Amino acid sequence: MGEVVFSTWGGKVVDHRGGPSGGGPSWAGEFGGRQLKAFIGWDGLVVTDPAVDLLAALQAYYQAVQGESCGRCVPCRVGTRVIYNVLVRIAGGEGLPSDLDLLRRVAWIVRDGSLCELGQAGAKAVLDFLDYYSEALRPFLEDSGRVAGGQRRPGPGGRVQVLASGRVLVGNDRGKGAAAASPAAGLTYKPFVTAPCLKRCPAHLDIPAYIDAIKDGRYEESLAIIRQRTALAGVLGRVCVHPCEENCRRGNVDEPLAIRGLKRFVADYEVKRGRRPVAVCGGNLFTGPWRPAGQAGGEETTAVTSGKKVAIIGAGPAGLSAAYQLAGRGYKVTIFEALPVAGGMLAVGIPSYRLPRDILAGEIEAIKALGVTINLNTRVGVDVTMDQLQRDYDAVFIATGLHASSRMGVAGEDEGYGGFIPGVKFLRDLNLDRCPSLEGKVVAVVGGGNVAMDCARSALRRGAREVHLIYRRSRAEMPAHATEVRDAEAEGVIYHFLVNPTALVAEKGNIKGMQCVRMKLGEPDDSGRRRPVPVPGTEFFLPCDIVVPAIGQAADLSFLDGRIEVGKRGTISVDPVTLATSVPGVFAGGDIVLGARTVVEAVAQGNRAAVSIDQYLRQGTTSPTVEDELDAWLEKVGVYDPEEDVGIYGGRPRQAERVAPLAERVKDFREVEGGFDFYAGRAEAERCLRCYRVGMMVLAGEGESNG
C-alpha cells in the first residue's frame, strides 16, 4: 500500500509534500492488480504518489461529474462545466491569474447552490486543490497569461502540470490542455458513482436513479433500473428489511426516505395496469456498490452463445436471482426445487398477508420467460443425485436455504407430542394449506426473530384464542424488525420477555403447556447481546395447546454425501467473495452459506454467484473482481456519516403508506400494507436528496479510461 503524501479526506489534512510520507487514513493499494496512486472524491483528495499530475486528474474528475449532472439546476450543470473548462485552459498554458479566483467562486456557487449532493459534494475536490496548490501555480499563470493591449500574450511555457509533491512543470505543448483530461502515460483514470443508500443495499440497487425516475413520472424506467439487478421488485418492495434506509442522508434531516415503499410503488404500477412483470436483466453482471461514471446500470456485457448449462438447487431468492442473471447472460439454466411451488421461503416461509402469492408468482414467471426451467417436486439426493448434476451440467449452484428448525434443547422435545410444531414446518404447512384450524387454541411461540413474528401473527389469523410469544431476552435485544414487533403486539400477541422454556408438559400425548423460568441479562455473548441467565426460584407453568419453537433454522445437507466442505455452523463453506465451494464448478449461496438472513442478502448472493459462475465457465477459474475490491475499500473509507450535518432545513415528514384497519386485518390473510397512493408516492420521491458521490481512482498501468 502506498503511503499518504497528501490528503484532505474527511476534513483531516495530512501533508507530507516536503518530507517523508505516511499517516492519514488506510487506503487499499491495488484494484485489478493496479496500484492506487491517488483518489479524488466527495470528501477531498488523497495522493500516494508525489508524481501524480493533480491538474490533469482534476480535469478527468470534473468531466465525470459533468457527465453525471442531471441538468435540473444551473449551479451543477453549468458550474461544473465552467470548472472543467478553466482547468483545461490552465493546463493548456492559457490560464490567467484571475482563473484561480474564478475557480473558487464558481466552486462555492456549485457547493452552496446545487439542488443535490452530486454538485454539493463535487465542489470539494477543486476547493481543496486551490487551498493547498494555488500559490505554487499562480506564478506560472502570471508568466504565461498576461494581457497587454487587449491581446493575450503567450508565455514562454506550454502545458502546465501540478504534481502532488507541489512542483509545477511547464512543457512545450501550449494549448494542449484538453488532452490532459486523458491519463498520463502509465496511468489509468477510473471514475465511478456511488451513494450511501446504494452502498448499504446488499444487492446494490441504484436507488437514487430509480427514485429520480419516479420524481419525473417515468415509472417504467424506474422499474427497469431496479430490474437490472433483481427480478423481485414487487417482492423486495414488500418484505425487504431495507438496510438502505439506515444510510439515508434524509434521516439526518428529518426521517429516512421510504426506499422500500417506493420500490413497491413502481412494481404495483405495472401490476395495476394489468401488465405482467417483464425481465430486463440483459445479462449485465455488474454487481458492485457503485457504477462506472456515465454508465447507468453498469458495464454492458456480451451474451454467451456457447450453450453451456447451469444447474441450480433451490428456487428461493438466491437461486432465482442467480438464474435471472445467468439466463439473461445466455446460459441454459435449470432449477431443481423439492417443494411443489417455486419461491423457497418466499412461498412457504413468509405469510401471504405480507407477500401476496400473485405478486411472487408474477415475478417468477418473468424469470421463466428468459428460458429458465424450474423442476418442482424434485429433491436432489432422491430424485436426482449430485453426481448426475455435476455430470450433466457445466456448473452447479446450491441455494437450498434452511428448511429445518433449530432445536430448543428442552425436556420432551423429542417425544412427538401432538401440538408441538417447529416454526419452519408451521409456516410451510400454513402456506401450502396443510395447517389445521387453530380455532379456540392457545398458542405459544418461542423466539424473537422475524420467523417467530410470522408464526405468531399467522396463528391469530388461523383463529387462535390467544397467542403468547416467549423470548429469553428483553424487547431491546429482539432480532425481529421493529415494525414486525410493533404490529404483532398491536394485533394482540402477548409478549413474555426474559422468559425461557425448560420443559414441555403433555397429557395423553398432547401438549398442555410449558415449564418456564424467568431470566436476567448477564455479560455479552458472541452476538454482542447480553447473555440471558436463569433466575433461581422463578419457575412457572404456562398453559397452552400448541407450542411453536422459532429460535432458528437449520440446513439439511444429506444430499451432499459429505463431498463438499461444511463449516462448524452446519452451513456450506465457500470462498467468502467468489462463493466457490471445495469442489470445482460447484458454488453455494444464500442462507445455506450465511445462516438465516434476509431476502435481499440472498438476492445479493445469487447475483454474486452468477458472476463467479460466468467467470468459471469462461475462464475455468474464479477470482475477486475490481467491484469486490472497491466494495471492501468503500467500507473502510466510508460513504455515509450518521453524524453529518446535511445543512438543509427539515420539516418534510415521511409519507405514510396505507395500512388495513387493525380490526379487519387479523380476520384473514389479505395483505396488511397497501403501499403508497399516486400522490403520496410522488411526494415521497420528492424528498430524495439524490446523494450521488462521484469518485475517481488514479491507478498505475495504462488502460481504458472511463473519464
From Swiss-Prot:
The lineage of its organism: Bacteria, Bacillati, Bacillota, Clostridia, Moorellales. GO terms for molecular function: 4 iron, 4 sulfur cluster binding; FMN binding; glutamate synthase (NADPH) activity; NADH dehydrogenase (ubiquinone) activity. PANTHER family: GLUTAMATE SYNTHASE [NADPH] SMALL CHAIN, GLUTAMATE SYNTHASE [NADPH] SMALL CHAIN-RELATED. SMART domains: NADH_4Fe-4S. Its EC number is 1.17.1.10. GO terms for cellular component: cytoplasm. Optimum temperature is 85 degrees Celsius. In the absence of substrates, the enzyme is stable at 70 degrees Celsius but is rapidly inactivated at temperatures above 73 degrees Celsius. It is found in: Cytoplasm. It is an enzyme of class 1 (oxidoreductase). Component of a dehydrogenase that catalyzes the NADP-dependent reduction of CO(2) to formate, the first step in the synthesis of the methyl group of acetate during synthesis of acetate from CO(2). In vitro, can use methyl viologen and benzyl viologen in addition to its natural electron acceptor. Heterotetramer composed of two alpha (FdhA) and two beta (FdhB) subunits. This is NADP(+)-dependent formate dehydrogenase subunit beta. It comes from the Bacteria. Activity is very sensitive to oxygen. The activity in growing cells is enhanced when selenite and molybdate are added together to the growth medium. Tungstate replaces and is better than molybdate. Selenite is incorporated into the enzyme. Requires a sulfhydryl compound for activity. Inhibited by cyanide, EDTA, hypophosphite and mercaptoethanol. Sulfite inhibits the activity with NADP but not with methyl viologen as electron acceptor. Its main location: cytoplasm. Optimum pH is 7-9.5 (with NADP as electron acceptor). It holds the Pfam family NADH_4Fe-4S. Signal peptide: none annotated. The gene is fdhB. It catalyses: formate + NADP(+) = CO2 + NADPH. Keywords: Cytoplasm, NADP, Oxidoreductase. InterPro entries: DPD_II (IPR028261), FAD/NAD-bd_sf (IPR036188), FAD/NAD-binding_dom (IPR023753), Helical_ferredxn (IPR009051), NADH-UbQ_OxRdtase_51kDa_CS (IPR001949), Nuop51_4Fe4S-bd (IPR019575), Nuop51_4Fe4S-bd_sf (IPR037207).
